[in-house]
Amino acid sequence: VCSSDLYKYDADGALVPAMAESYEVSEDGCTYTFKLKEGLKWSDGSPLTAHDFEYSWKRVLNPEVGSETAYTLYGVIKDGYECFVNKTVSVDDLPIRALDDTTFQVELKAPASYFLTLTASTAFMPVSQANVEKYGEDWANSPETYVCNGPFMLADMKKDESYTFVKNPNYYNADEVQIDTVNYVFLNAPETVKMAFDNGELDIATSVNSDALKAYTGTDKLMSSDRIGYRYYEFNCSKEPFNDARVRRALTLALNRKIITEGILQDATLPQLYGWVPYGIKDIVDPTQDWRDVVGNAFEENVEEAKALLAEAGYPNGEGFPTFSIKYTPSTELENVAQAMAAMWKQYLGLNCEVTAVESGVYWADETGTRASGDFDIAYMGYTLDYPEPSAAFTVLENAEGKAKTRWDCPAYLELCNKMRSDIAGQEREDLYKDMEALLAQECPVMPIYNYVATALVSERVKGFTRNANGHPNFEYCTIAE
């Protein structure tokens, strides 16, 4: 809503220039030089230049900032990992540079055919250096301090209640933006959301429960599309018995995902997931098809194999297996799913699993939290990828204590990740991704359960509303019929 990248996705989902006018790539595929559009401005009217992009990208890779999205950059940018993780390279020495006000250049550690898609993701969006330095940690906390460069800007903010955005007159494409105001209202109860939409109080509802699905399925008001994210569970691979891949795979194969999605969650629109790459990503060889559909499942539910693996690991019929737990944040939905998983493991494998809700602040805390400190056996996680390419999924598991907190150490996987960042393309890249999923299906540091779906109820008077692959709403191309 408020930010725009070098590139963006248009109304048809095509990658097109936004802040950038054009780009060039060096012969070795490692240096990208972007030419920015002339006359770009921040929402306060101040100039937006290549220096803002240099500052912003370096800020994400600055270990003192501690950005959670840094892995997206350090996975491809030369010396990024050494800067953010190893701290052996100064952020000032990174090969991210403004050559002049409209020319921005970056060097990659290796050719990456998907790099341009990264420049349309959240981690790569610019922030105003002047604004961040003036207001510090509060730079984005109020309309008075927040300067942006997207189609809309923040006009009013009532925390946990509502946000009001108004058209940004300084947006480079402002003449094409037809809506003057977007009001975001936070309604906690799904039934309240449905009632508000039913009564015409909402033009768009992005929280759609099972009752709303039943009421609007088959109508033009229900909008649904794949979202490149999923619900999954992490194993703590540093703790016995979950340091044994056979145990992790056994628990993964013993889950009936259809019961979870259609029975427990009562949502038949949620695709069950049998691989680490979610639906909603175009195939490498044939981009008219979904990668997941072309490649097929990386594993299948198989209780007999699960029993055999558990016996091979020294726990025949679950004998001698310690009581363990699933941890999650307080939620009736998450509790019901955890109870169902525990019941399946008890029924099929003879295992005793406790379910434990942990207060959200404790669960998600950066250093001392449940996941960050490793205080779990199995932990709930939900995640939406930063960009629509399989590499975005594989990068999540590259660092044992990065975005995923699995504490999984696998040199063979790291070797494949390094190969992933080479200049291979086409069928060779597709085969590499298959190999990476096959390895994950054997090692199982994580258990994918189901794919997210971006559903919304959209009033008949709204035209042109879209959501990108991340599920983020896009109002740039919307019109409202009076």
What does each model-found stretch correspond to?
Residues 271-312, 331-335:
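Structural transition elements
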Residues 254-286, 333-343, 368-482:
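Detector for C-terminal structural segments
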Residues 169-215:
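Ligand-site clamp/hinge motif
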Residues 49-56, 101-107, 150-151, 179-181, ...:
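Alpha-helical secondary-structure segments
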Residues 1-27, 147-148:
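N-terminal lobe/hinge region of extracytoplasmic solute-binding protein
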Residues 159, 303, 307, 311-385, ...:
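Ligand/substrate-recognition segments at binding pockets and active sites
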Residues 11, 101-102, 107-177, 181, ...:
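Gly/Pro-rich hinge or "lid" segments in bacterial periplasmic/extracellular proteins
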Residues 35, 54, 68-130:
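Surface-exposed binding/hinge segments that line
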